[in-house]
Amino acid sequence: MKLQLVAVGTKMPDWVQTGFTEYLRRFPKDMPFELIEIPAGKRGKNADIKRILDKEGEQMLAAAGKNRIVTLDIPGKPWDTPQLATELERWKLDGRDVSLLIGGPEGLSPACKAAAEQSWSLSALTLPHPLVRVLVAESLYRAWSITTNHPYHRE
C-alpha cells in the first residue's frame, strides 16, 4: 500500500519541508509515502472562491485517482493514535493505495468531501495547513510503528 498526501499549496517554509521529509524518509519501502502539492488558486478580494475550490478539488481528485480518499477536515472523525493504527491496518487489508487530502485556506471542495470514504479530524482547532503536513506524517509513522511493534511509539 502506498500513502499519498495531496495538499493544496506549494512554497512551504523550510521547517515544514524539514519536518515532513524527516518522517517521509522513515517510512518502510513496503509503505511508501509521497507528497503531491496542488498549486493554490489566486485569491484576491474579487476572487470567485467557489470556482477556485472546484478547480483545486478537480486537481486533488485527479491526483488521487482510484485510491481510497480520506479527507482531513475539522468535522471529521477524531482518531487517537491506536485508532489510527487500526485504520492503517484496515487500509492495508483493503488493498488500495490511500490519498489523504488537505484543502486550501477555505478547505476542501464539495466534490472532495463527496468522494471521501473517510474524514479524519486532527483537532477541533483550526490548524495552519503547513503544520498539518508534519502532524499527518508523524501520526501515520507512529501508527505504522504500533502495527509493527517498532519502538518509536511507547505506551
Swiss-Prot record:
Subcellular location: Cytoplasm
EC number(s) from the headed UniProt entry: 2.1.1.177
Reactions it catalyzes: pseudouridine(1915) in 23S rRNA + S-adenosyl-L-methionine = N(3)-methylpseudouridine(1915) in 23S rRNA + S-adenosyl-L-homocysteine + H(+)
Cellular-component GO terms for this entry: cytoplasm
Primary localization class, coarse: cytoplasm
Broadest EC class assigned to this enzyme: transferase
One Pfam family from the record: SPOUT_MTase
NCBIfam families documented for this protein: PRK00103.1-1, PRK00103.1-4, tRNA_RlmH_YbeA
HAMAP family: 23SrRNA_methyltr_H
Name the UniProt record assigns to this protein: Ribosomal RNA large subunit methyltransferase H
Encoding gene (name): rlmH
